[in-house]
């Protein structure tokens, strides 16, 4: 499925100015349950078919695909508006793509765990400063703020 494209008029020795762009946007989704290493989960538009997804991945991204399975996920309708009317989220299609033999995919770890660093010396002095009295106002308790 492509946008309506207006092709330029023919020119002698005419260069190829046509660029194919799809109307589909697919999202790579981290699976909720454990999947085999050769299976990748996508969220795709309702209009997209298995054949469209296979061609999309093979032609644009050069990803070899063995099989494509799809299912329709119904949108939640638990939310209610100010008039107590249910608000339904739109349905979407989930595709499970099995990669060709020998291909594996592991979801990237975007936010790795950081190693605990040594505490900042200023953070260590802060509780001590709070406990000490203000030298500008001797004899006044610390709870009596300025």
From Swiss-Prot:
Major localization class: mitochondrion
Source superkingdom: Eukaryota
Subunit structure, interactors included: Component of the mitochondrial ribosome large subunit (39S) which comprises a 16S rRNA and about 50 distinct proteins.
Species per Swiss-Prot/TrEMBL record: Rattus norvegicus (Rat)
Record region (Disordered): 108-146
Any GO molecular function: structural constituent of ribosome
GO cellular component assignments: cytosolic ribosome; mitochondrial large ribosomal subunit
Entry-linked Pfam families: Ribosomal_L23
UniProt KW Ribonucleoprotein keyword: yes
Compartment(s) of residence: Mitochondrion
Family from the record: Belongs to the universal ribosomal protein uL23 family.
Record keywords, A-Z: Mitochondrion, Ribonucleoprotein, Ribosomal protein
Alphabetical list of InterPro entries matching this protein: Nucleotide-bd_a/b_plait_sf, Ribosomal_uL23-like, Ribosomal_uL23/eL15/eS24_sf
Presence of keyword Ribonucleoprotein: yes
Protein name: Large ribosomal subunit protein uL23m
PANTHER family the record matches: LARGE RIBOSOMAL SUBUNIT PROTEIN UL23M, RIBOSOMAL PROTEIN L23-RELATED
GO biological process, one term: mitochondrial translation
